[in-house]
């Protein structure tokens, strides 16, 4: 056991985590050169296309160190995006150490910091690595100072490497073996295994990734899930050497996969403890804290026949992604669907794309909203995650919106732009610290503004140099109103949005104008209105298509023309009473773009 090393690779987006893991796999001979491809561990098509890691992946490798010993390395490649920080914290729970990869050109960024603090809270050994030293812009001396200054770990002798060219990667492995402690645990104690991750395989059922904390798990054992008390048979178990390899047992301290023929998706939840049925452990391992979704949106299948498939697909996805929350919802405009909770907008996009690709569904998304805390006039407190659930205005005593604490790291020259952006997003500055050329800014900004498009705007205003990490701070009373959209004086529930009173007239007007462009013209006038309560704040009309009924009257009496025009008018009026308006998918997405043009 003293030769096992469990570690994760943590870093900011694009600092080279996945490339470094490729090199490590190559050096340890996990794959032949023929099977080697860029980003071996990003197995989803989506991950490859976007060039980001979404799911944490684990690999077991054998490394022959300079001291002649052979070490077993279990390592986990983690995502770098804010939205997937939950994946990172789960991976870290299975390790004794972490490689903190920092780009020697870019320096320390917000996500580097956030992930590093997570690792330190879990009391892991953090090994700093300076990557991309082959770049002309690389300045390892400055970055090493930055790491000490901002993160607070000693980086004077940080390993320098270039994952792309492979220079210095063996040094990284040597440092790993030297600095990261071996796992602790008792081989003879009753089995305790932590489920780090699980996914659904159409042939095998639920496949779980486990870290053995105590004891040994053998093939054919009866395994008990501690939270439910269910007993399963361990049919197959093994390790990933990126490829799935079968083993007969997993020993204390190892990380591997397990198949128990669990068909029920909720059979083995992530963060649960597995033990032997004959000789169970006394207590479960401390699991993971539940993450609260920050953004909610309605997802509806385009054709209602897909509803069943959609429900199954969500079930399978939520097994793989423990932070996804969903509950059934019905809308008068869109029929039956689900209200889903996500960790951020990127997470929402990814989930929607995965559903459409992996499960072949066509989906409509409504505009994302955050959770509001509402105190009603009879002193009840309710949480509202959808504009249609908001009680009528005169029943609301106080509406509180969630405030996010945003930590930003940026070069000094962009400070002015970023502060202007934060103020425009109704932010309040709470802290500002200078580290050399970098500035660390802390702002409290309403969550609704952060999740909408703050990240994109922050990147564009700072030419991509600023980085952001945010977390929920508290609820704060605020003057928010619901803007409803009426089409031919009927409310469309899927188009409502909650916004600040000061912005409501602009948002309403902009939304109405957008809708006017998107709704196709019909045989009768369509009135589009935006309203707060019963007060109409904006209106636009999609003009009717009309036939020229006077074309056949050359000359002739004026009363004849009047009669024909009146007849057309009456016909249109009748049509308007019975006609209904088909809304295209783009209309529902129009809300997403309201306020994007710097309003």
Swiss-Prot record:
Its EC number is 3.6.5.n1. Signal peptide: none annotated. Residues 2-184 form the tr-type G domain. GO terms for cellular component: plasma membrane. Its main location: membrane. One of its GO terms (molecular function) is guanosine tetraphosphate binding. GO terms for biological process: positive regulation of translation. It is found in: Cell inner membrane. It is a peripheral membrane protein. Keywords: Cell inner membrane, Cell membrane, GTP-binding, Hydrolase, Membrane, Nucleotide-binding, Protein biosynthesis. It catalyses: GTP + H2O = GDP + phosphate + H(+). It comes from the Bacteria. Pfam families: EFG_C (PF00679), GTP_EFTU (PF00009), GTP_EFTU_D2 (PF03144), LepA_C (PF06421). GTP binds at residues 14-19, 131-134. The keyword Transcription does not apply. Coiled coil: none annotated. Required for accurate and efficient protein synthesis under certain stress conditions. May act as a fidelity factor of the translation reaction, by catalyzing a one-codon backward translocation of tRNAs on improperly translocated ribosomes. Back-translocation proceeds from a post-translocation (POST) complex to a pre-translocation (PRE) complex, thus giving elongation factor G a second chance to translocate the tRNAs correctly. Binds to ribosomes in a GTP-dependent manner. Belongs to the TRAFAC class translation factor GTPase superfamily. Classic translation factor GTPase family. LepA subfamily. This is Elongation factor 4. It comes from Enterobacter sp. (strain 638).
């Amino acid at each position: 056991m003293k030769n096992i090393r469990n570690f994760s690779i943590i870093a900011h987006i694009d600092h080279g985590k996945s490339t470094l893991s490729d090199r490590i796999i190559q050096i340890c001979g996990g794959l032949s050169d023929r099977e080697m491809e860029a980003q071996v561990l990003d197995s989803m098509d989506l991950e490859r296309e976007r060039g980001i890691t979404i799911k944490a992946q684990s690999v077991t490798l054998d490394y022959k160190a300079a001291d002649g010993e052979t070490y077993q390395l279990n390592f986990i490649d983690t995502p770098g995006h804010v939205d997937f920080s939950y994946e990172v914290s789960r991976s870290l729970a299975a390790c004794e150490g972490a490689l903190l990869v920092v780009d020697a050109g870019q320096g320390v960024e917000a996500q580097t910091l956030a992930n590093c603090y997570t690792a330190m809270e879990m009391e892991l050994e953090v090994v700093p690595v300076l990557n991309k030293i082959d770049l002309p812009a690389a300045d390892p001396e400055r970055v090493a100072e930055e790491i000490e200054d901002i993160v607070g770990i000693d980086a004077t002798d940080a390993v320098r490497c270039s994952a792309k060219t492979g220079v210095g990667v063996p040094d990284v492995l040597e440092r790993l073996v030297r600095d990261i402690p071996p796992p602790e645990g008792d081989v003879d104690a009753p089995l305790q295994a932590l489920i780090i991750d699980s996914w659904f395989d159409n042939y095998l059922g639920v496949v779980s990734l486990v870290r053995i904390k105590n004891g040994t798990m053998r093939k054919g054992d009866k395994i008990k899930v501690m939270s439910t008390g269910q007993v399963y048979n361990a049919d197959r178990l093994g390790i990933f050497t990126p490829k799935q390899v079968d083993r007969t047992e997993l020993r204390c301290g190892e990380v591997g996969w397990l198949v128990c023929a669990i068909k029920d998706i909720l059979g083995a939840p992530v963060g649960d403890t597995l033990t032997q049925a004959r000789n169970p452990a006394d207590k479960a391992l401390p699991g993971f804290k539940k993450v609260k979704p920050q953004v909610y949106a309605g997802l509806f299948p385009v054709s209602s026949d897909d509803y069943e498939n959609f429900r199954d697909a969500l079930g399978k996805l939520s097994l793989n992604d423990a932070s996804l929350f969903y509950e059934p919802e019905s809308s008068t405009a869109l029929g039956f669907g689900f209200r889903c909770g996500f960790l951020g907008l990127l997470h929402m996009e990814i989930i929607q794309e995965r559903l459409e690709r992996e499960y072949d569904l066509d989906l409509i998304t409504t505009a994302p909203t955050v959770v509001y805390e509402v105190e009603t006039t009879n002193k009840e407190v309710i949480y509202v995650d959808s504009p249609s659930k908001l009680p009528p205005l005169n029943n609301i005593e106080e509406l509180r919106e969630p405030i996010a604490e945003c930590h930003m790291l940026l070069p000094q020259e962009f400070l002015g732009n970023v502060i202007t952006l934060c103020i425009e997003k109704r932010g309040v500055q709470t802290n500002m610290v200078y580290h050399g050329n970098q500035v660390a800014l802390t702002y409290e900004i309403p969550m609704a503004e952060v999740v909408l498009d703050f990240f994109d705007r922050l990147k564009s205003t700072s030419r991509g140099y600023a980085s952001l990490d945010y977390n929920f701070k508290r609820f704060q009373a605020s003057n928010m109103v619901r803007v409803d959209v009426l089409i031919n004086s009927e409310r469309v529930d899927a188009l409502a949005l909650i916004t600040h009173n000061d912005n409501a007239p602009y948002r309403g007007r902009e939304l109405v104008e957008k809708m006017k462009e998107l709704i196709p013209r019909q045989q009768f006038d369509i009135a589009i209105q935006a309203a707060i309560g019963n007060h109409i704040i904006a209106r636009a009309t999609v003009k009717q298509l009309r036939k020229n009924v006077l074309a056949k009257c050359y000359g002739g009496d004026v009363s004849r023309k009047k009669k024909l025009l009146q007849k057309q008018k009456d016909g249109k009026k009748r049509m308007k009473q019975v006609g209904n308006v088909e809304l295209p998918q783009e209309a529902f997405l129009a809300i997403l773009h309201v306020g994007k043009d710097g309003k």
